[in-house]
């Protein structure tokens, strides 16, 4: 019998054992290639709502589609569903259960923004990415959790689209209507900022409770009816929004003139309600909705959806959130496949109890960071458009601008972040208001763009504050009946305001409210408009910069400027007739009178007997002739052409001088020579003079800013008080606006005057709240009133100007006419005179050239004396004397008579001048020697002719 070796038996056993183990390992490896890893994903939704049912259906379809086309993936998402029961606490409890008990790697949900806040904090603590496709509140971003992923657009992305619509139609004010929770409040700051960027403003807010009943909704709607603004931006959940518009239609707020702008909170889910009733109540509404680009993939999905719900109702209508849910699951499945699944476990702290919901035992996922990183890198074209996460959420996308018309949701435009609103069909990007959108049908089936505001017709009157003053009642006078306490406002400002209201294209009924202030502080009255106590302020309110910070002013309806008023000094003067001309003009004129008289004497002395005779006679005649030209009363005739030329030019100069003198003297008597006591306001500061200002006005601060000391400022409340301060010497000058100064001057025109404006202001204007729609219309109406005759009638009624009051615009500065105004005339007269004199001298020297060149008289002095003697003689060759001589010869009286020099029996009477002239001729003839013999007969003939002429 053969005995086996024990050692050999052991080796054989070991061989088979190793072979078995290797085979088992190889088998496990082969089997592992066909196995997948399950990734737990929690889903928290309100399962009893149609919205959640649609989204859950979309999630299941997404999982089926994804793994159908990616069967080779080694990971599979396992969905664990929890019902949040439309409750914030229940949603947080569901998330806590998924994290603690199921140890999910990610959570999808919740449905609302309110449910999401605490869930995000739990997920952040456990490092579990929470992906929401429907929580759009911008406030969730402030949690600043890296594990919060928003696979949808938040509400901040649509506010710029809404602002673009407001800008496109030129509206300036809107009313924000939103649900009273985090969802509604989150959009308001962003909407306000976006509207301000386009110069529009949220002027009022209306909060609607989430669970509001019909009575609460109606109460808020009636409040909206009392507001002037008719542009409403509505942001609320669809269920509340549908009831809101139903009530708005019932009370007539869906008629012409109203503008309703809806956010995508309602527009994205329009089809989730009974289609007919919801759209019927929202005719003419504009809204924005996330734009879903067309694609083949989306088209196929819609066909499959319709097959799944062949008899679909509105509850089964596919919406943008169902598409977002589909894309969210797709993105998560893609991210999971790219991660390392070896870290699929939680790190748990030491438990402090057996309570399953104890937050102290909440584990931390090791897988969360890698999954979050992979998710942020996912990018693909989904059903709702491009899917790419930027900072944990989708980027701002394109929005459709929707107009609800009948049963249709007509797309009339698109809004893009890059170029704003464009026409949906023409892609027009013109900047003209309203032309970027297609035709819009507004509420009430109107095609006219609403102006965005109107005066309420519910009986509410415009509350107008007016100041109660003690003085200057011409502007505003609030008369209060002590018995009935009824107020009757009158005055210039009131009448202007009522005239302006009549020019408006609609009816505005003012209700005047008296503003009583001990110090008549206008700043405080204007501030009441800012607080809402008044709808407007009417009165003598000046437009100044600090007031315009919190209210709006209309265009001014009065003159602008702050001027200085000073007393007049009456400069009555005996020598007032000398005032029109300055001293240099008087002296120059007098010198020219003498000069012209001298020139005329030179030109006329040899040919005109009026300018001959004794020296004193000739001097008197010359002066008389020259000065009598002032009134053209000279009786002497000029016979020389040169003298006539000089006199003609001089008469023109005198005419201009006399007319100017008369006009200026008249103006001096018109203003009565009144002069201001002060002309420079800076002198008041220099000499520390007291000045007055109207109590309660901005003038006080203006004067202090210009350097006036507080002790110099003396207030007054009326024109009478101002006159008293001047009369008793308390003030030297007063500063006030031009309108007030005119009132004072109309009562005391002979005592004070207004110096030119020192400081510029904008004048009086009406006050309205910031961005009030009335401001522009009232400003346009002011232009119509001020440019017409009605304005002048109102001014004449309240500011009657006395007949003896000088023109306030008349300059009281020096109006002396100086030589500089007439030097051209004097230059012409001087040139004409010297030219005539030069011609005369040249002719005279030419006639006596034989004397100048005669060698018998070598002495220059002798020749000069000879020329002087000849100048003093009559020019017998003159046409004047020749004419007289011819007349004497042909006269029948002298015909046949003897010479008067030889006939001594019947001498003709001779004047002393005639004797003097004959004597001079004889002396001249004797002294000339040889000339006497040659010219004696001629002299006798001349004497005879002269005597005969004078005898006649």
Curated annotation (Swiss-Prot):
Residues 889-908 have a biased composition (Polar residues). The lineage of its organism: Eukaryota, Viridiplantae, Streptophyta, Embryophyta, Tracheophyta. Residues 604-612, 634-637, 843-952 are cytoplasmic. The chain crosses the membrane at residues 583-603, 613-633, 638-658, 822-842. Glutamate-gated receptor that probably acts as a non-selective cation channel. May be involved in light-signal transduction and calcium homeostasis via the regulation of calcium influx into cells. PANTHER family: OS06G0188250 PROTEIN, OS09G0428600 PROTEIN. Expressed predominantly in leaves. Glycans are attached at residues 34, 60, 355, 428, 546, 664, 728, 748, 784, 809. GO terms for biological process: calcium ion transport; calcium-mediated signaling; cellular response to amino acid stimulus. Belongs to the glutamate-gated ion channel (TC 1.A.10.1) family. It comes from Arabidopsis thaliana. This is Glutamate receptor 2.7. The keyword Glycoprotein applies. Residues 889-914, 932-952 are annotated as: Disordered.
């Amino acid at each position: 019998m053969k005995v086996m070796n024990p050692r050999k038996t052991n080796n054989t056993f070991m061989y088979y054992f190793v072979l078995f183990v290797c085979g088992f390992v190889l088998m496990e490896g082969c089997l592992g290639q066909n196995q997948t890893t399950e990734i737990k994903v929690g889903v928290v939704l309100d399962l009893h709502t149609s919205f959640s049912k649609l989204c859950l259906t979309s999630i299941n379809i997404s999982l089926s589609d994804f793994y159908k086309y990616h069967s080779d993936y080694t990971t599979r998402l396992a969905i664990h569903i929890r019902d949040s029961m439309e409750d914030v606490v229940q949603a947080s409890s569901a998330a806590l259960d998924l994290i603690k008990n199921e140890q999910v790697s990610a959570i999808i949900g919740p449905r609302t923004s309110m449910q999401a806040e605490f869930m995000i904090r739990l997920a952040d603590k456990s490092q579990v990415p929470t992906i929401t496709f429907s929580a759009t509140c911008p406030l969730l971003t402030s949690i600043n959790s890296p594990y919060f992923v928003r696979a949808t657009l938040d509400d901040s992305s649509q506010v710029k689209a809404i602002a673009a619509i407001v800008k496109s139609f030129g509206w300036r004010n809107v009313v924000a209507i939103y649900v009273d929770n985090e969802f509604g409040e989150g959009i308001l700051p962003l909407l306000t900022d976006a509207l301000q960027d386009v110069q529009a403003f949220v002027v009022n807010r209306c909060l609607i409770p989430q669970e509001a009943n019909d009575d609460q909704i109606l109460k808020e709607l009636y409040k909206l009816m009392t507001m002037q603004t008719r542009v409403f931006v509505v942001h609320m959940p669809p269920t509340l929004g549908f009831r809101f518009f139903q009530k708005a239609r019932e009370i007539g707020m869906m008629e012409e003139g109203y503008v309703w702008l809806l956010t995508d909170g309602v527009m994205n889910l329009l089809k989730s309600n009974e289609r007919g009733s919801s759209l019927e109540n929202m005719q003419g509404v504009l809204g924005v909705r996330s734009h879903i680009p067309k694609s083949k993939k989306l088209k196929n999905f819609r066909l499959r959806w319709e097959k799944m719900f062949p008899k679909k109702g509105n509850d089964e209508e596919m919406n943008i959130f169902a598409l977002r849910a589909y894309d969210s699951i797709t993105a998560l499945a893609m991210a999971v496949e790219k991660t390392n699944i070896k870290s699929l476990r939680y790190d748990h702290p030491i438990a402090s109890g057996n309570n399953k919901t104890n937050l102290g035992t909440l584990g931390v996922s090791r897988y969360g960071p890698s999954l979050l990183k992979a998710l942020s890198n996912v990018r693909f074209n989904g059903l709702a458009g491009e899917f790419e996460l930027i900072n944990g959420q989708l980027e701002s996308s394109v929005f459709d601008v929707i107009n609800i018309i009948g049963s249709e949701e007509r797309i009339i435009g698109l809004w893009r972040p890059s170029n704003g609103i464009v026409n949906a069909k023409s892609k027009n990007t013109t900047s003209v208001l309203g032309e970027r959108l297609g035709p819009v049908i507004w509420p009430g089936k109107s095609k006219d763009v609403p102006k965005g505001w109107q005066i309420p017709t519910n009986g509410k009157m415009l509350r107008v504050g007016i100041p109660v003053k003690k003085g200057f009642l011409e502007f505003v006078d609030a008369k209060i009946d002590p018995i009935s306490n009824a107020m009757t406002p009158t005055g210039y400002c009131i009448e202007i305001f009522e005239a302006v209201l009549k020019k408006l294209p609609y009816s505005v009924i003012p209700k005047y409210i008296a503003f009583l202030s001990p110090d008549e502080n206008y700043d405080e009255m204007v501030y009441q408009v800012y607080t809402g106590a008044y709808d407007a302020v009417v009165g003598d309110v000046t437009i100044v910069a600090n007031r315009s910070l919190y209210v709006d002013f209309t265009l001014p309806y009065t003159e602008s400027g702050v001027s200085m008023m000073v007393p007049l000094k009456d400069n009555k003067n005996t020598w007032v007739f000398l005032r029109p001309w300055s001293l240099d003009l008087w002296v120059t004129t007098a010198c020219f009178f003498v000069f012209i008289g001298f020139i005329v004497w030179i030109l006329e002395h040899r040919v005109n007997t009026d300018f001959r005779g004794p020296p004193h006679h000739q001097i008197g005649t010359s002066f008389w002739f020259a000065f009598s030209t002032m009134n053209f009363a000279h009786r002497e005739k000029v016979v020389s052409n040169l003298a006539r030329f000089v006199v003609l030019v001089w008469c023109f100069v005198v005419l201009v001088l006399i007319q100017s003198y008369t006009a200026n003297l008249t103006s001096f008597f018109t203003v009565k020579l009144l002069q201001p006591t002060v002309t420079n306001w800076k002198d008041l500061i220099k000499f520390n003079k007291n000045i007055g200002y109207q109590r309660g006005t901005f003038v006080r601060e203006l004067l202090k800013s210009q350097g006036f000391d507080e002790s110099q400022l003396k207030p007054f409340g009326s024109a009478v008080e101002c006159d008293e301060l001047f009369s008793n010497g308390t003030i030297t000058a007063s500063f006030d606006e031009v309108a007030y100064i005119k009132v004072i001057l109309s009562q005391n025109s002979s005592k004070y005057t207004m110096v030119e404006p020192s400081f510029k202001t904008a004048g009086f204007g009406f006050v309205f709240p910031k961005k009030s729609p009335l401001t522009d219309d009232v400003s346009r109406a002011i232009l119509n009133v001020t440019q017409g005759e009605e304005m002048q009638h109102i001014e004449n009624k309240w500011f009657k100007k006395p007949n003896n009051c000088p023109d306030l615009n008349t300059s009281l500065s020096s109006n002396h006419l100086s030589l500089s105004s007439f030097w051209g005339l004097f230059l012409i007269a001087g040139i004409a005179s010297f030219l005539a004199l030069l011609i005369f001298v040249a002719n005279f020297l030419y006639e006596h050239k034989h004397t100048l060149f005669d060698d018998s008289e070598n002495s220059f002095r002798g020749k000069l004396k000879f020329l002087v003697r000849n100048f003093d003689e009559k020019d017998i060759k003159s046409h004047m004397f020749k004419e007289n001589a011819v007349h004497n010869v042909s006269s029948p009286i002298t015909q046949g008579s003897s010479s008067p020099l030889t006939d001594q029996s019947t001498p003709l009477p001779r004047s002393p001048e005639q004797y003097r002239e004959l004597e001079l001729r004889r002396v001249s003839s004797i002294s000339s020697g040889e000339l006497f013999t040659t010219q004696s007969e001629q002299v006798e003939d001349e004497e005879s002719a002269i005597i005969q002429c004078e005898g006649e």
